[in-house]
Each structure stands twice: as C-alpha cells, then as structure tokens.
Regions:
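Structural motif
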Residues: 55-59, 92, 190-192
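Beta-strand-turn-beta hairpins that frame and shape the catalytic cleft
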Residues: 2-4, 141-146, 184-189
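N-terminal beta1-alpha1 cap of cysteine-dependent amidohydrolase-like domains
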Residues: 1-83, 199-245
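A glycine-centered loop/beta-turn motif at secondary-structure junctions
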Residues: 175-211
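Pocket-forming structural segment of enzyme catalytic cores
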Residues: 108-181
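Glycine-rich beta-alpha junction loops
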Residues: 12, 153-155, 195-197
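Cysteine-nucleophile active-site neighborhood
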Residues: 63-140
Length: 245
C-alpha cells in the first residue's frame, strides 16, 4: 500500500483560518484511493527530522505585526526546512507559512525579520489588508481555475528563480500589483489562499499529492479518478460569482 508521511507544522499556532482542512482533504483523497496518510503534528519544542516525511504543511497565523510567537521556528527547524526544500520534498505553505519560507518580512515600522530563505521571495507590510474571495489560474492545472479567500497585510514579491503559482483573475494575490499569486520553486506550493484551499480545488490537491508520491517512489504517478462533483460545483460557483468564467 502506498503511503505518504505528512508533517503538519505548528497546528496550534498556524491555523487561524481553518487551514488544517487541507490536511483532512489530502488524507481523505489518499484513503479514497486505497492509500495511507500518516500525519504527524510538530509544534514548539518538538524535534523535526525532515527525512521522516514526504509532505509538509504550514498554515496561516497572526501577522508579524501582531507579534506572532515563533521563536522555536528560527534555528534548527528553519535550517531543516530549507534543506528539505532543496531536497525537493513537497511543501504546501499558506499565508504566514508561505511568508516564513522567504528571505525576510519587513513590518510597517521598518523592522526586518530574517526568515528561512528557502524561497527567494520577500514580504513587506502594506497599509491596508488585502481581503476577500479571489480567483487565479495556473498553467499546471490547465483550464481549471483556483478559488480561495485572502486575508493578509503582507505584500510578497518574487525573486529570481521563483515562479508564481498562478495569475490573478480577480482579487489581489501576492501584492495587488503584478497579478502574481503564490510561488512555485522545486516542489514548494506557496499561496495566500485560505478556504480551506484544497477541498474546493481538488485538481490542485491531486497535483500536490501526485508530486509527493512521485518524489517518494521515484516514478510517474497516475492517480485514479474520484467523484469530485460536489467539490467542483463549489469551485465553479465561486468562479462564476467572481466573474471569472
């Protein structure tokens, strides 16, 4: 039986917007195909050995402006995560988790927080929150559009070697300026999309699952189809509501 070992980082501190639903989605989509998901939660004080896992998830939490408490992250865990990214382990990082993978975050007061440096991106605080339902398209997903809910003060800018996850059709995405949303580097999927994201974007969910299975087993993976009628109805409803057909 195929199995993915999933590491859920800081579920107690980085789950303000029900981003843990992404873990549930991945787990169920594996089980429905007769595969197994072994989920381990890693929080402050817990030892992290990235070699033990195939897929990593980091969710959204408080803004840096509001005093996010992640001192445990900086140091050994941060170095391990950077190593895992370069080793092409699969990551789904949402909002704060996405920002944490970058080079730095600069607050509205000009305070710079040096971060993981796993992605060549940086984030700066804006004056107003970027908030609301939004929609973007991704070359990896063909004609299927991705919908989510954004709620962030940070403006993220991509550097050399990093591609956007998608192009914004409605909403703000990374910064509200250049129409980019999220980031793709090696096997990292970074995004500002809450929702939770994956339950109403099953094609993206399977893209992430397939990437993790292929990385683990070293061969091309063709996932058996699932009945995604309800999931795609939810997706299409939001696409239509946002005027992105």
């Amino acid at each position: 039986m195929s199995e993915l070992k999933i590491c859920y980082l800081y579920p107690d501190m980085l789950n303000l917007f029900s981003d843990g639903g992404n873990i549930t989605c991945i787990k169920k989509r594996l089980e429905w195909r007769g595969m197994k998901a072994d989920v381990t939660e890693i929080s402050a004080g817990d030892k992290l050995n990235v070699n033990d896992y195939d897929l990593f998830f980091i969710g959204g939490g408080q803004d840096f402006e509001n005093g996010i408490q992640l001192s445990d992250y900086f140091g050994e865990k941060s170095s391990e995560i950077k190593k895992a990214v370069e080793d092409e382990k699969v990551f789904l990082a949402v909002c704060t988790g996405y920002e944490l993978l970058g080079n730095y975050y600069k607050s509205s007061k000009g305070v710079q927080y040096d971060l993981t440096g796993a992605l060549n991106i940086h984030t700066e605080a804006g004056k107003e929150r970027l908030l609301g339902n939004y929609c973007f398209e991704s070359e990896e997903l063909g004609s299927i559009k991705v919908v989510g809910f954004e709620n962030h003060i940070g403006r993220t800018y991509l550097g050399e070697g990093v591609k956007p996850l998608g192009k914004v059709l409605k909403g703000n995405g990374n910064n509200g300026e250049d129409f980019t949303e999220g980031a793709r580097y090696k096997n990292v999927f970074g995004t500002y999309a809450h929702g939770a994201l994956l339950p109403k974007n099953p094609v993206l969910a399977d893209c992430i699952i397939a990437a993790a299975l292929e990385r683990k087993y070293g061969r091309k993976i063709e996932l058996s189809p699932l009945d995604d009628t309800f999931e795609m109805n939810a997706n299409k409803y939001m696409v239509s509501r946002l005027g992105c057909e």
